[in-house]
Structures are given as C-alpha cells and as structure tokens.
Regions:
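Bacterial N-terminal signal peptides
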Residues: 7-18
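Extended intrinsically disordered, low-complexity coil regions enriched in Ser, Thr, Gly, Ala
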Residues: 131-160, 193, 286-292, 296-297, ...
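Detector for the c-type heme attachment site
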Residues: 115-122, 146-147, 183-186, 271-277, ...
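Positively charged n-region of N-terminal signal peptides that target proteins for export
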Residues: 1-4
Length: 379
C-alpha cells in the first residue's frame, strides 16, 4: 500500500510540474528584492540542468484504477485527478453547484479556479484562499491582475504571473460567477493551526510549499525568524488536493503575542473588523495562511501591489521589519474567523482604477485617514 501511495504522489508531482511549466506566463526581468522573506515564498533551490538527450518526465498512463481518499466517498481516476474534464472534488457536500469557470475553466485560456484554490475555496499556502471574500473585493483583485497593478515582489513566483494571464483572458461574466460562488462559501475555521516552537521539523520545498522530511532525513532545526507552514496530514493528501487537509504553521515562541500588540498599534481592526473578520469590501484576515499574508504585506511594501486602495496600506507596511512580518502573520493566522458569517458583503460593483472609494466622515484606518475625495488620491 505504501508503494501505491508513493507512486500516486510521484504521479501527481509529475503532472503538476508539467502544468506549472506550461502555464506560467513569462516573468518580467525584475530583480529579486535583497530583503525578500524567502520563507513566505517557499523559494526553491535552482534545479539541476537536464541531462543531454534526456526525455521529459511523463505521467504514468491512466489504467482506469479508482483512487480513494480517507473521509471521502468519492472515487477518482488519475485523469480526473489531473482536472480532466473537471476539477477533483473529494467533498462535494462542502459547497453548492460550481459555475463552469470554477469547475472546468475554459482551457487553454483560463484554468478552472477550483483546481488551485480548491472547490471549497480554502486555498493552499502557495496561493490564496478566496472563500468568504466579498464579490466586490474579488472582482477588484481580478481587475488589478488584469491591469498589471497586482504582481509579486519576486518575479519567480510563477502562479502570480499565471493569474495575470488568466485575468486578461477571463470574461466579466466568468469573473462575476467565480466571485459570487466563492463569496457564498464560509471562511474555514481551524484551517491553519499555529504552533509556537523554538525548533522546527526539517523540511523540503516542492512547488513553493514546505513538506516535513521523513525517515533518515527527518530532524529538527532552529526556526529562526521564519514561519514554516506545512500540510498537517502530509504530502499525499496535499498532492491529492484534499480540501479537508489543513496546515500547521510553526512560528517563533512569543510571535503571536508580539503580533497582537503590533496589530493593536496599527489598528488593523478599524478597517478589517473587530475580530479581523472583514468589513464590507475590506477582506477578512483571521485564520488565513501566514505565508500568503506575508507575501501580500511585503508586496504592498515594495509596490508590487499598487491597485485600488493600496495607498491605505502603504503607511501601515512602510516600516515593517522582517520580524514584524513574522509576528503579525502569526497572530492573524492564530485567530479563528467567526463561526457564523457576520461579514457585511459588499454589493457594489468593482471600481475602476480611475475611481476612488468614498467615505462619509473621517474614518481612521490605522494611522491614516480612509476618507477619499474623488480625483484627489493616487491609486
């Protein structure tokens, strides 16, 4: 049985590495910031050069075997696990009917959203978890990708380049359908479990994700100034895209308390809600992947994200240190979203890059005013 599991993991790795290479849009020739928090990006060591005359790895043929996953009554073939003709959905009871753009996509222009972000929208450390995002926020992010206003500080982050390509190809109807589907899904509780440690399990990096080493390679090492986020149930369930298999985020001892103090100082709750559960079009933060959150904060800091409302975040992140990123993302990830959906879902249409958010009165977001007057604030 162990050999079967290993063969399955190897099969999925071959398939996904081929997909990633085929789908990544060319990255611009930009330098990598010298202060990049590599733990958040899962930066992989350079691959060895291919052997002369070596044929590219190919996935094993689908022999029709039905694969099963613990906790699911669904059975899938290897072809179905690759997302053909629709994404692997081990837990259809988690959600309502999926629109075609989420379940099938429109290949080759647009990959199915649910393949990478999962049918329940919980996402994975290397990407985003769109579950529970308001329709207006989701659509605005797609506009930002489309208009090159949302990139990655690290040009090697291939799936961001891929998202930019998808956003340029997706129709407004497809984007809206995906936005409405994910907005209706609950923000998951306990998806990320935060553990404060001084020593962290040794890991390897594959596909920008950390996996705990096993066997003779297993061991511990100092965590240092990092967050190490790993699949809670190992690599096999991760590679099979199990939407019930969450993550463990190992953080330095004391990081959560320090992050709480920093969030209070920056008054994050003024815009993101009292419990960071989101407020109107402002996204929920509680319980989200610390790897993802650190990338976004750093992208605001470097200007890689400079879409609508990014000016509100710039003063917040301007002086954040590498330690601040670790602490505040540890705190954010440690907070569970509310059991009931108390978010105020925004109904407004996404604003263009030439429009400005309008606020009544002087609402304060952190240390800066959220009040904008149309035409007077650069985005």
């Amino acid at each position: 049985m162990r050999k079967i599991h290993l063969a399955l993991v190897a099969f999925v790795l071959v398939v996904m590495s081929g997909y990633a290479l085929a789908q990544q849009a060319p990255a611009p020739a930009r330098p990598v910031p010298t202060n990049l928090p590599e733990w958040a990006w899962g930066v992989m060591p350079p691959a060895p050069p291919p052997q002369p005359g070596a044929a590219p790895a190919a996935p094993p043929a689908d022999d029709g075997s039905i694969l099963h996953l613990e906790g699911s009554s669904v059975g899938l073939t290897r072809t179905q696990l690759r997302g053909i003709p629709s994404i692997p959905d081990w837990h259809p009871e988690d959600h309502g009917p999926m629109p075609d753009i989420v379940s099938k996509g429109r290949m080759p222009a647009v990959r199915a959203c649910g393949f990478c972000h999962l049918p329940n929208g919980r996402g994975r450390p290397e990407n985003a978890g769109p579950a529970g995002l308001s329709v207006s926020y989701f659509m605005q992010q797609m506009e930002d990708f489309k208009n090159d206003l949302r990139k990655s500080s690290d040009p090697r982050k291939g799936n961001v380049n891929t998202m930019i390509g998808f956003a340029k190809q997706a129709t407004p109807e497809e984007v809206k359908a995906a936005a409405e589907y994910f907005a209706a899904l609950p923000i998951p509780q306990g998806w990320v479990k935060v553990k404060e440690v001084s020593m962290v399990p040794k890991t390897k990096i594959q596909g920008n994700v950390y996996f705990e080493l096993e066997g003779a390679q297993a061991g511990k090492e100092p965590i240092g100034n990092r967050v190490i986020e790993v699949p809670e149930h190992g690599q096999e369930r991760f590679e099979m895209r199990d939407g019930h298999a969450g993550y463990i985020a190992y953080v330095p001892v004391g990081a959560v308390k320090k992050g709480e103090a920093l969030a209070s100082k920056l008054q994050c709750s003024m815009c993101h809600g009292a419990n960071l559960e989101g407020l109107g079009p402002v996204p929920a933060l509680a319980g989200r992947s610390p790897s993802y959150m650190a990338r976004q904060l750093f992208d605001f800091q470097t200007g890689a994200r400079h879409g609508l409302w990014s000016d509100l975040m710039k003063p917040i992140v301007a002086k954040m240190t590498a330690e601040d990123l670790v602490n505040i993302t540890a705190y954010i990830a440690s907070k569970n979203p509310p059991a009931a959906d108390v978010r105020q879902t925004a109904r407004a249409k996404p604003q263009s890059r030439h429009s400005r958010p309008m606020w009544n009165g002087s609402t304060i977001c952190g240390s800066i005013s959220c009040r904008f007057v149309s035409g007077h604030s650069r985005v």
